Amino acid sequence: MKTYEQLIAICISTVLVMAGQGIVSPILPLYADSFGVSTALVGATVTAFGLARLLTNVPAGMLADRSGRRKLLIGGPLVTAFGMFGSGLANTIWILLGFRFVAGLGSALYMTGATIYLLDIASAEQRGRFIAANQGALLVGVGFGPALGGLIADRYDLSMPFYVVAVGGVLTAVYSFFRLPETRSAEQARIARDVAPGDQPSRWALLRSTDFLLVGVVTIGVFSVRAGVRQTLVPLQLSDSFGLKVDELGLLFTALGLIGVVLIWPAGLATDRFGRKTIIVPTATLIAVGIGIVAVADTLPLFIAGLTMSAVGSSITGPAPAAYVADLATEDQRGAAMGLYRTFGDI
């Protein structure tokens, strides 16, 4: 299987996985709120998902090094499907939180495996573009998913999108089984299997790198905006303060996602051409300004303007931090490095 065929295959798989997350994103806060709980518990539905990823990313990276990438790319969607199906069946907030944790675990398995898979098939000069392509697939799924989720919830009920996502997870696992060959080399497997206990610290040497820790801080900020603000607080604010309905929320989130779809490939090209740091600094600033506007906005147009600015910044930043981490890591650190990188994003 040629490199670009592998890239296309992993991108299709990512679209399917992330469409599921996009489908539930606009309705999750409303679904949790329907249990009559506090705003803190509504936010906990996102926290539970993120906590599972936080705890799973590094073990997933190590598992990818030891047992191969395919197990994560197939098993992750199946675990997510189970979590989503259970979320739809939940009759208390605590059951919902438990199944959200399971769904997050599956998400971590897949996304960590997919990132390592990309680094296996990309040269150093291609990393920005390959990561951008996969993030573009992610944005397609997350971007178009909300409109579908809003329409499904409006047509049926708030639990139906979870069942749709569960079916999609099973289909993704089947697709990955037939279309994604193993990319871990025999030499990588031998190193991971035979490494002596005394050599283990070398895998974590990146934690002593100032550059790695700084890009980790940037990653924390970018992912916090996406999950903590855009997926939790923004839907509630738009619904409660500006009166948007669930289908309107879905369309707005889709529009924001389209910004990323348009910008992510040029961002990957720029990352490879001009360097990672040149992209990271100005776009991180743009994200901060956009969220500041959202925080003080008292009109819908101003609120949407702030959201748009943060979406533009997030889209252009996209591939740069991951490519930067890949540049810092040696081949035997790859699984641990990507696990740590994704852990920063889930803090």
Regions found by a protein language model. Name each.
Residues 56-68, 263-275:
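Helix-to-loop junctions at the C-terminal end of transmembrane segments
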Residues 99-138, 323-324:
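Cytoplasmic helix-loop-helix junction between adjacent transmembrane helices
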Residues 36, 68, 89-94, 243, ...:
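Helix-breaking motifs and short loop linkers at transmembrane-helix boundaries and internal kinks
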Residues 27-39, 232-247:
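Short amphipathic helix-loop junctions that connect adjacent transmembrane helices
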Residues 167-189:
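C-terminal membrane-cytosol helix-exit motif in multi-pass small-molecule transporters
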Residues 83, 94-102, 290, 301-309:
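Paired small-residue
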Residues 1-3, 181-215:
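Juxtamembrane intracellular "pre-TM" segments in multi-pass secondary transporters
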Residues 71-85, 278-293:
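Structural signature of the two symmetry-related core transmembrane helices
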